[in-house]
Amino acid sequence: MPKERRSRRRPQPIIRWVSLTLTLLSLCQPIQTWRCSLSLGNQQWMTTYNQEAKFSIAIDQILEAHNQSPFCPRSPRYTLDFVNGYPKIYWPPPQGRRRFGARAMVTYDCEPRCPYVGADHFDCPHWDNASQADQGSFYVNHQILFLHLKQCHGIFTLTWEIWGYDPLITFSLHKIPDPPQPDFPQLNSDWVPSVRSWALLLNQTARAFPDCAICWEPSPPWAPEILVYNKTISNSGPGLALPDAQIFWVNTSLFNTTQGWHHPSQRLLFNVSQGNALLLPPISLVNLSTASSAPPTRVRRSPAAALTLGLALSVGLTGINVAVSALSHQRLTSLIHVLEQDQQRLITAINQTHYNLLNVASVVAQNRRGLDWLYIRLGFQSLCPTINEPCCFLRIQNDSIIRLGDLQPLSQRVSTDWQWPWNWDLGLTAWVRETIHSVLSLFLLALFLLFLAPCLIKCLTSRLLKLLRQAPHFPEISLAPKPDSDYQALLPSAPEIYSHLSPTKPDYINLRPCP
């Protein structure tokens, strides 16, 4: 349904909104492909003003989770953003300022179907290559958006936001016919083996993902009968027909296989929601550009870089050692200075006490002499014979005081510097002696490490090489059951008539990264 607008008057900067609302309740089947075509043009003499088209719908949480799946480089990508409080999804992701482009969203009831095993590139939401042409006095840019939606219900609104100088607008939307259903021959479905179908299906998938490697689990796809009886199990993911990997192998000797479980070799095709569903094994994708079997090469460091690094490390350690030693020396010097002050105060106090003691002895001797003179004047003998007691005299020893005065200062008796061996005295300052001490210590440490270096290097290199040789591997399929087990084996290969087998219901495929 095209809409056109042409104007020959002087253009003005305006904004155009072109909206299209469709009721897809009666039109949309389980899977629909829509082709959105937009042409934008401006007058040739007014080319300085950029034009941009934005295509918006609504947001779907399924789409946001779908963005975390392992996309290949050639698969369509999108980014999530918020504009005026509403979430917006951009196809493709914006890269700088674009002259022509769009942003798209998908409703809560619709989601893109890509990538999935068995899909071709035209089934994925993607942009066609933009083209430019001249139409009269207009430059016209044309681009097509392909959307592949499923299970659409309710109103589906597409809005193009276009701004420029009176642009020429042509917009159309139409549905691409559904691909024909695969023609399965009228044969017994019990003879449809799963292994052959997997191989044929993966061969078709390789065309859609040329830059990816496809991995699968080496186990048959045991699955609950969710496709037949609409049953669910607790350890099965939402919307998946295959359970988790730990229950892909089912011991059939423990329970009846007809109660709740399905053997894919007995029935591989199912008719679900107006289409055939194909039970598939767990398949995953990996980017070949990031996964390589060749181990990364080890580049030897240049000798100049090694010497520079070693020299810088040595100089840094030497500086740290000198700084620490200088700080310790300063603290020790401060402590000695404080102790010297305390020592001087003690010596002064002792000398003063000795002087006072001498004065007391003089007073005692003077008093004794006065008493003797008084007793003799009175006609008696001296004091001691009169009282009939031995006379005592105060004798003060000065040897300890003399030794205390001969003490040298504490700074001269305590060494704060590193002592040279064999009592060498080169007349160097404390900083120079500390620096030489640090350099000699590092030199001795380096000599010690040189003796242990060969052993350490050998151990480290062997460990690193062992880790580097562990290249990523892809598991191969195993057609035989595990030995000494009760697991059922798979049936023989399928006839060549199943070469055109392809899926039409890819909801039950589990895509996850390779281990």
UniProtKB/Swiss-Prot annotation:
- Location of motif CX6CC in this chain is 384-392
Q: Which residues lie on this side of the membrane: Extracellular?
A: 34-435
Cite a GO CC annotation: viral envelope
Gene Ontology biological process terms, A to Z? fusion of virus membrane with host plasma membrane; symbiont entry into host cell; virion attachment to host cell
Q: Which residues are glycosylated?
A: 129, 203, 230, 251, 256, 271, 287, 351, 398
Keywords of the record, alphabetical order, are:
Cleavage on pair of basic residues, Coiled coil, Disulfide bond, Fusion of virus membrane with host cell membrane, Fusion of virus membrane with host membrane, Glycoprotein, Host cell membrane, Host membrane, Host-virus interaction, Lipoprotein, Membrane, Palmitate, Signal, Transmembrane, Transmembrane helix, Viral attachment to host cell, Viral envelope protein, Viral penetration into host cytoplasm, Virion, Virus entry into host cell
Which segments does the entry list as coiled coil? 330-376, 388-420
> How is it modified post-translationally?
Specific enzymatic cleavages in vivo yield mature proteins. Envelope glycoproteins are synthesized as an inactive precursor that is N-glycosylated and processed likely by host cell furin or by a furin-like protease in the Golgi to yield the mature SU and TM proteins. The cleavage site between SU and TM requires the minimal sequence [KR]-X-[KR]-R.
**Keyword Coiled coil listed:** yes
- Fusion peptide: region residues: 304-324
Q: Where is the signal peptide?
A: 1-33
Q: Where are the transmembrane segments?
A: 436-456
Topology feature Cytoplasmic, residues: 457-515
Q: Which residues does the annotated region (Immunosuppression) include?
A: 365-381
Note the site residues: Cleavage. 301-302
Q: Which cysteines are joined by disulfide bonds?
A: 212-215, 212-392, 384-391
Q: Where is the lipid attached (S-palmitoyl cysteine)?
A: 455
The protein's matches in InterPro entries, at most eight in alphabetical order, are given as: TLV/ENV_coat_polyprotein
What is the documented function of this protein? The surface protein (SU) attaches the virus to the host cell by binding to its receptor. This interaction triggers the refolding of the transmembrane protein (TM) and is thought to activate its fusogenic potential by unmasking its fusion peptide. Fusion occurs at the host cell plasma membrane. The transmembrane protein (TM) acts as a class I viral fusion protein. Under the current model, the protein has at least 3 conformational states: pre-fusion native state, pre-hairpin intermediate state, and post-fusion hairpin state. During viral and target cell membrane fusion, the coiled coil regions (heptad repeats) assume a trimer-of-hairpins structure, positioning the fusion peptide in close proximity to the C-terminal region of the ectodomain. The formation of this structure appears to drive apposition and subsequent fusion of viral and target cell membranes.
Question: Subunit arrangement?
Answer: The mature envelope protein (Env) consists of a trimer of SU-TM heterodimers attached by a labile interchain disulfide bond.
Supply the domain comment: The 17 amino acids long immunosuppressive region is present in many retroviral envelope proteins. Synthetic peptides derived from this relatively conserved sequence inhibit immune function in vitro and in vivo.
For this entry, the protein name equals: Envelope glycoprotein
Organism (species): Bovine leukemia virus (isolate Belgium LB285) (BLV)
Lineage of the organism: Viruses, Riboviria, Pararnavirae, Artverviricota, Revtraviricetes
